[in-house]
């Protein structure tokens, strides 16, 4: 089978398409005939050798996938061959950018009916990340106020949609070119990142930080006493404020969380954010897009099967 591989760490130029043997599902795993798989910033970190969880090369890149189960390993009771599924391969976040991939049965779910495989492959990590930030870490409830930093990104787009569905009051900070897009997703107040004055923002119960840096540090000024700043950006330590809590985490994709997302995808209340769609042999181009080459807004997807 064909697979997107690296044999050493480095830039997009280290990516190759190899012919390798089809993997065999282990205990608690399934083998998926991949229809589509995602390409995301954490794939670039793995490629560069900056991931704390990925194995050493040689390895197959990719974590998000959508496809059809081809075989089932031992101790898997909830899935069978022929099931359409989507989700994540494993806790190491590798192996999905291939014609076949093994996946932990605890990190996949039955694919929702409404989205295509390309759309489904764009969802798992980013949508679950948004869900966890809002409802498992910030614990926000209806009518509370939140501030989203980086609301136009892949996670941000889902965070806005999920927050709007829950009835939260949403302030979003984005670049000027993204303001109308984020407003259309459901944000109540959209501010230009070049002009935002954090101390003038109506005090919020939680900040959802997707960009880190100076904006995250300044955002503490906008949080109510007892509120929280939740971040997925670990490039710098979280500031310590006695009156405001802070939390940093890695997303944990599970069947239960994916099933929640699936319900909303099927009823149309959550819309997939698909960007550029490429073929498997264009994986290097996809990683060049991660590095700044022009591409459509949304998650980059590799279309693998029919």
State what each model feature region is:
Residues 171, 184-247:
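Glycine-rich cofactor phosphate-binding loops and adjacent beta1-alpha1 units
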Residues 21-38, 50-92:
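Glycine-rich beta-strand-centered segment in the early N-terminal region that forms part
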Residues 92-104:
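A structural motif shared across PLP-dependent enzymes of the aminotransferase-like
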Residues 79-80, 140, 223:
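Short, well-ordered loop/turn sites that connect or cap secondary structure elements
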Residues 258-306:
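C-terminal hydrophobic helical "lid"/dimerization subdomain
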Residues 121-192:
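Mid-domain Rossmann-like dinucleotide-binding core that forms the NAD(H)/NADP(H) cofactor-binding site
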